[in-house]
């Protein structure tokens, strides 16, 4: 059985220590999962992972992230930080944003990215685990606005694999760029719940 698990490259933002990485790496591998693909050595990126069709995606995703020791930044509603969840959100790496701010959510995120020397922003482009009719453009607009690349990952439940699909530098022309991004997923993904697979991915799944 393939037990490949990458070592985090030196320019990628890191978290944790050797002990925590080994614990979560071994937990990830013990579940029969592994990685495929070369992990890019980039200080800044928007990282997307698809398909998102189940809550269990978060479990495999977070055990992989903690095993890698990568620091992924997620943005969430500022009101969540007024609840008992605040310590957990801070530990995960969630940054508060105001959805009704005048400058807009996307621009808030871009502005924050521009203050950081290293940052990987994590996003699920479907925006929901249930079947989405379209892929939300937020991840793309953030990458274009911050002038950073997109790194693509996929869940492949049939083979218990997380694929790293490579790096895509957006041109600013959304529709053709999205087609290229989605085409990189062909043959490299399978959802936990096929009935909830986003429509743009349905005709790209390997039969």
Model-inferred region functions:
Residues 2-11, 15, 19, 102-207:
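Non-catalytic C-terminal accessory region of glycerolipid acyltransferases
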Residues 38-100, 157:
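Catalytic core of membrane glycerolipid acyltransferases/transacylases, capturing the structured
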Residues 33, 70, 94, 147-148:
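Short glycine/serine/threonine/alanine-rich loop segments
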Residues 32-40, 61, 107-110, 137:
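A generic local structural motif
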Residues 29, 66, 144:
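Anion (oxyanion) recognition and catalysis
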Residues 16-52:
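Helix-to-loop junction immediately C-terminal to a conserved catalytic motif
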Residues 24-28, 50-52, 96-101, 128-130:
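Short, flexible loop segments at the rims of nucleotide/cofactor-binding pockets, characterized by
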């Amino acid at each position: 059985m393939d037990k490949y698990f990458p070592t985090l490259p030196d320019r990628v933002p890191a978290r944790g220590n050797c002990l925590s990485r080994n614990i979560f790496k071994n937990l990830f591998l013990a579940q029969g999962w592994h990685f495929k693909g070369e992990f890019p050595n980039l200080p800044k990126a928007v990282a997307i992972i698809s398909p998102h069709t189940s809550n269990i995606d978060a479990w495999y995703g977070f055990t992989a992230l903690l095993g890698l020791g990568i620091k992924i930044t997620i943005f969430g509603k500022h009101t969540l930080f007024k609840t008992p969840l605040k310590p957990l959100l801070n530990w995960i790496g969630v940054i508060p944003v105001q959805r009704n701010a005048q400058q807009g959510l996307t621009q808030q995120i871009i502005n924050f990215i521009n203050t950081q020397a290293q940052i990987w922003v994590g996003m699920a482009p479907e925006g929901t685990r249930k079947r989405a009719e379209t892929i939300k453009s937020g991840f793309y607009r953030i990458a274009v606005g911050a002038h950073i690349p997109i790194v693509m990952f996929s869940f492949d439940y049939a083979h218990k694999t997380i694929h790293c699909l490579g790096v895509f530098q957006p041109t600013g022309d959304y529709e053709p760029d999205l087609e290229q991004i989605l085409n990189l997923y062909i043959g490299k993904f399978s959802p936990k719940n096929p009935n909830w697979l986003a429509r743009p991915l349905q005709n790209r799944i390997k039969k």
